[in-house]
């Protein structure tokens, strides 16, 4: 029941954010990859599929770099779900973009890996290449853990390929 509530809440927030972003332009990313890439036991590694929205209206250029909020989620092949919202930095070297991010979120293990808590933190580094005027192809590596706030803290390392498009 708790999982269903959070899923509906996330969907509602995501759709409202997307509707607001449609007034201008929206940056939507779709990604797929491997969950728990460095699985020592070999029993938790699975595929993942996700979506992420970046709000260009809230983009800020600061002395530390360019930042914007992100909201997204993914589901794994073992029915684990992670829903998150956070901030992403943007640093560019020509057509190459380096995009570090940090996102707290809600994790539901489903039939997959128990990360020890519903509250998990995702840190990610993404390297992207502008392939067309409004499109980007990226490689990401992320780590999700609960910072020892949960019963256990096994953490998980993930990697994925992302396609981003501004609509």
What kind of region is each of these model predictions?
Residues 27-38, 64-76, 99-108, 140-145:
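Transmembrane beta-strand segments that form the barrel wall of outer-membrane beta-barrel proteins
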Residues 20-25, 56-67, 92-98, 134:
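Short loop/turn motifs that connect adjacent beta-strands in outer-membrane beta-barrel proteins
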Residues 78-102:
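Helix-adjacent hinge/juxtasegments
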Residues 53-55, 89-91, 129, 143, ...:
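Residue-level signature of outer-membrane beta-barrel architecture
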Residues 1-24:
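Cleavable N-terminal export/targeting peptides
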Residues 21-57:
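Outer-membrane beta-barrel initiation region
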């Amino acid at each position: 029941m708790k999982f269903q509530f959070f899923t509906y809440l996330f969907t509602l927030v995501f759709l409202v954010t997307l509707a607001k972003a449609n007034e201008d332009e929206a940056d939507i990313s779709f990604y797929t990859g491997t969950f728990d890439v460095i699985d020592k036991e070999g029993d938790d590694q699975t595929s993942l599929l996700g979506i992420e929205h970046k709000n260009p209206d809230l983009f800020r250029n600061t002395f530390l770099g360019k930042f914007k909020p992100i909201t997204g989620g993914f589901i794994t092949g073992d029915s684990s779900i992670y829903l998150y919202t956070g901030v992403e930095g943007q640093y560019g070297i020509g057509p190459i973009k380096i995009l570090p991010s940090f996102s707290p979120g809600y994790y539901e293990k489903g039939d997959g890996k128990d990360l020890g808590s519903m509250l998990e933190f995702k840190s990610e580094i993404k390297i992207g290449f502008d392939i067309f005027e409004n499109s980007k192809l990226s490689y990401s590596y992320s780590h999700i853990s609960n910072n020892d706030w949960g019963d256990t803290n096994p953490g998980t390392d993930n990697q994925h390929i992302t396609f981003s498009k501004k609509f």
